[in-house]
Amino acid sequence: MCCAVCGPEPGRIGEVTPLGPCPAQHRGGPLRPSELAQASVMAALCAVTAIISVVVPFAAGLALLGTVPTGLLAYRYRLRVLAAATVAAGMIAFLIAGLGGFMGVVHSAYIGGLTGIVKRRGRGTPTVVVSSLIGGFVFGAAMVGMLAAMVRLRHLIFKVMTANVDGIAATLARMHMQGAAADVKRYFAEGLQYWPWVLLGYFNIGIMIVSLIGWWALSRLLERMRGIPDVHKLDPPPGDDVDALIGPVPVRLDKVRFRYPRAGQDALREVSLDVRAGEHLAIIGANGSGKTTLMLILAGRAPTSGTVDRPGTVGLGKLGGTAVVLQHPESQVLGTRVADDVVWGLPLGTTADVGRLLSEVGLEALAERDTGSLSGGELQRLALAAALAREPAMLIADEVTTMVDQQGRDALLAVLSGLTQRHRTALVHITHYDNEADSADRTLSLSDSPDNTDMVHTAAMPAPVIGVDQPQHAPALELVGVGHEYASGTPWAKTALRDINFVVEQGDGVLIHGGNGSGKSTLAWIMAGLTIPTTGACLLDGRPTHEQVGAVALSFQAARLQLMRSRVDLEVASAAGFSASEQDRVAAALTVVGLDPALGARRIDQLSGGQMRRVVLAGLLARAPRALILDEPLAGLDAASQRGLLRLLEDLRRARGLTVVVVSHDFAGMEELCPRTLHLRDGVLESAAASEAGGMS
């Protein structure tokens, strides 16, 4: 979506405009980092469709899909963004699929660009038809001229076409259709006599039809995007895009509220706040209390009501402006090399002491490493280094320790400690953890109820129990010699798991504990049957789990990525495999996970983190799986939401005899749900002695 924020007065934030093309003031100048990122992504999509349409037999029609990403670029961005994407996609397609792939990209860029520009200018189908006919005539005339000049090439092409037609005629003759065979050869011979006119007609009609298909697809896509609330958009106000004074702090929020489009209630209730230069402010509150919404307002989004005063513009992502580090670093790390990512997006001519920044975040030894090989904690510290390279006056850290293990959390906190003194920046730290909030100069709580203000605490590592004695009950899952290697047989091969052996009994609760990069998620996907192990086997009732996908349900670490529908009832019905019209079954599924059935009519993007996890569980449990695997189920949840989710899972395990496997780097409060604990380190299950020694180190 493209949501522009308009505000004519420096230091004030204006109104949010509806979805549409990007503002006209961005038409000049070189490509900005956001435009370059969009061009890269869309170029990759266009190149993939063009390559598949050439190298896969009978897949030529897939080339039409390439008009959608190029059309979206033409609709939302400058023409030079589309040109950059076309050049990149064309080079990739040519290197892999030859001239056919290159021409597929060119056709997609032309047709997608045509439909996108027409859409952006508010014109309709007649304009598309006229424009495509003109374009078809130009393309056809160019092709006729080329073939007229290149006589030998023309004769070669016609010979190939004649051979194909003769083959078709011979096939028809064998089917006792001699008349049809003769007609095919006669009509083709007549067409060759008037080949310039046939070619012109072919290009005119063909491009018009493909343009109409692209127009329809782009219109459907934009219509669908309009129905998705713009929940976490970080577009800066237009004042930030000109040479205006950058001054994000001190900032004062006076009686600020925020409500997302089409929402029934405020996401952020009335709040007044001052953020002073050089201070460390912690923001705490329950899931759904508005912490992330407040972060968006501090980063430049306009409130629904109230005023936001600051001495200059927000300067989001600019030198001396505002920098934001989010809880999912994968979305912020764009460089392929660690050192490159630190300076990615900085203005030309800007110098940054990359070595000092990497040393500050503890990554000085990894400067030449591929960012794809970093652990979650290392990625988060890299994102922090890239933010600090902009020398921000205000740094916003939104739940940056949520997705990392205790070791990574300690490393991040060590970096954040004293950050305001080392860099003379204001630090706004949104967190659930008690020790993180305690280190702040001030703490702001967005929760009214005392029950929602308690913080997440850390706990001692539980004693490991990894014995594999004969089970008292029938085994639900059995892993025998499981090992897995990514990119096996290539120079980039990486071993994730080695010789994993254990049994999970029916109705058992097992915690698989390990740090970032230990192989926990790989093991979870193997147990769910979504990944086939390189060696060994994961068995359910004696059969490999990958042959019975769905019998073992998997809840992803990021619940939002598992929710594919727009509304709760549609999501639950789709995941469970029944019709959304069966509202009684939807209501029953929601009730099982402790949600009000009335929630079924709510949009997914209006849910809190805890509600999203429960909606995922509702859909999975409605399929009556033999076992349930949860990958980092407590990540991103406040203390109350964690307790509620754990109680729900404990009740389900006792009442249904449900087999539960939790994969997590957190273990606080897991004792009742998971009496048995396995420790995973570097892809290997550890013995009790080794695990205890590792925990003390």
UniProtKB/Swiss-Prot annotation:
Residues bound to ATP 1 are 285-292
Where found? Cell membrane
InterPro entries from the entry?
Answer: AAA+_ATPase, ABC_transporter-like_ATP-bd, ABC_transporter-like_CS, ABC_transpr_CbiO/EcfA_su, ECF_ABC_transporter_ATP-bd, P-loop_NTPase
Instruction: Tell me what topology the record assigns in the membrane.
Output: Multi-pass membrane protein
Provide the protein name. Uncharacterized ABC transporter ATP-binding protein Rv2326c
| Organism encoding this protein | Mycobacterium tuberculosis (strain ATCC 25618 / H37Rv)
Task: Say if the entry is tagged with keyword Transport.
Answer: yes
Which GO CC terms are listed, alphabetically? ATP-binding cassette (ABC) transporter complex; peptidoglycan-based cell wall; plasma membrane
What keywords would UniProt list here?
A: ATP-binding, Cell membrane, Membrane, Nucleotide-binding, Repeat, Transmembrane, Transmembrane helix, Transport
Give the binding site residues for ATP 2.
514-521
What's one GO MF term for it? ATP binding
Transmembrane region(s)? 45-65, 86-106, 128-148, 198-218, 280-300, 522-542
